[in-house]
């Protein structure tokens, strides 16, 4: 069975693993997921990510994300929400880019220049599809 929304699947896996205090989470690999992981790493929400090559019995590459926790196991990732969905796409012009929690969070935007945060997109004056909010 095919997956309808792989980005929502990734965000749900991250949210669930974070709530359960797992150190790492594994999911099927795709370029867009790797780009989202790179944005999350650059913003300090995850420690690192890597791509595992498939074994004999496993089909396809796997994306492994190492979650980040502070001292006393405080979560770095407080919340994550999918905005644009396959049934209802959400686009924003460069002047209308959303702010998450008044600038404390990050909106991940898919632009013609790749995946950017809302701050980067505002700085470059580009709009695009609002994929997710992270705080």
Swiss-Prot record:
Note whether Nucleotidyltransferase occurs among the keywords.
no
Write the record's keywords in alphabetical order, separated by commas: Ribonucleoprotein, Ribosomal protein, RNA-binding, rRNA-binding
KW Magnesium (keyword) present: no
Single biological process term from Gene Ontology: translation
Gene Ontology molecular functions: rRNA binding; structural constituent of ribosome
Q: List the disulfide bonds.
A: none
Entry's Gene Ontology cellular component terms: ribonucleoprotein complex; ribosome
Identify the InterPro entries for this entry.
Ribosomal_uS8, Ribosomal_uS8_CS, Ribosomal_uS8_sf
Pfam families from the xrefs? Ribosomal_S8 (PF00410)
Entry-linked PROSITE patterns: RIBOSOMAL_S8
Entry similarity comment = Belongs to the universal ribosomal protein uS8 family.
Record function comment:
One of the primary rRNA binding proteins, it binds directly to 16S rRNA central domain where it helps coordinate assembly of the platform of the 30S subunit.
- Subunit structure as annotated in this protein's UniProt entry: Part of the 30S ribosomal subunit. Contacts proteins S5 and S12.
Quote the HAMAP family the UniProt record gives: Ribosomal_uS8_B
- The name this protein carries in UniProt is Small ribosomal subunit protein uS8
Organism of origin is: Salinispora arenicola (strain CNS-205)
């Amino acid at each position: 069975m095919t997956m309808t929304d792989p980005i929502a699947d990734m965000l749900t896996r991250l949210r669930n693993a974070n709530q359960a205090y797992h150190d790492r989470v594994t999911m099927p690999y795709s370029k867009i997921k790797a780009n989202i992981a790179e944005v999350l790493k650059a913003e300090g929400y995850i420690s690192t990510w890597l791509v595992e090559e498939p074994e004999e019995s496993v089909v396809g590459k796997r994306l492994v994300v190492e979650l980040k926790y502070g001292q006393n196991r405080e979560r770095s990732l407080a919340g994550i929400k999918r905005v644009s969905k396959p049934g209802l796409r959400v686009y924003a012009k460069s002047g209308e880019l959303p702010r998450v929690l008044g600038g404390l969070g990050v909106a991940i935007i898919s632009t013609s220049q790749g995946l950017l945060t809302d701050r980067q997109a505002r700085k470059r004056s580009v709009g695009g599809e609002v994929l997710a909010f992270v705080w």
